[in-house]
């Protein structure tokens, strides 16, 4: 346990941020998993809707600094490519 007042505050802030980031990452994983499940069943319309939702969550996570912007771009690209393969 820290004795310095500023370090006690930093620990408190870090714990709050860790929990917030964990929540964002969890909802992000859920959105991507739902997209993959819809894509595997072959439901194009549902997959397209879920792709937009996942892309929105990826952008939001990147803007909050939970994940890196390039990681968000790569994941969005991968799911967009998968949706494009349905129509091709």
Swiss-Prot record:
Region feature Disordered, mapped onto this chain: 1-28
Protein biosynthesis recorded as keyword: no
One annotated Gene Ontology cellular component of this protein: small ribosomal subunit
Pfam families on file: Ribosomal_S20p
The organism's place on the tree of life at top rank: Bacteria
Gene3D superfamilies: Ribosomal protein S20
Record's compositionally biased regions (Basic residues): 7-23
InterPro entries, alphabetized: Ribosomal_bS20, Ribosomal_bS20_sf
Record's keyword annotation contains rRNA-binding: yes
Record GO terms (molecular function): small ribosomal subunit rRNA binding; structural constituent of ribosome
Record keywords: Ribonucleoprotein, Ribosomal protein, RNA-binding, rRNA-binding
GO biological process, one term: translation
Function: Binds directly to 16S ribosomal RNA.
Similarity section: Belongs to the bacterial ribosomal protein bS20 family.
Name of the molecule in the record: Small ribosomal subunit protein bS20
Organism, scientific name: Salinispora arenicola (strain CNS-205)
């Amino acid at each position: 346990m820290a004795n310095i007042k500023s370090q006690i505050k930093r620990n408190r802030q870090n714990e709050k941020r860790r929990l917030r980031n964990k929540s964002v990452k969890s909802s992000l994983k859920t959105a991507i998993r739902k997209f993959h499940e819809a894509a595997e069943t072959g439901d194009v319309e549902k997959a397209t809707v879920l792709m937009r939702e996942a892309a929105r969550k990826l952008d939001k996570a990147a803007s909050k600094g939970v994940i890196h912007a390039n990681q968000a771009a790569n994941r969005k690209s991968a799911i967009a490519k998968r949706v494009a393969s349905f129509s091709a």
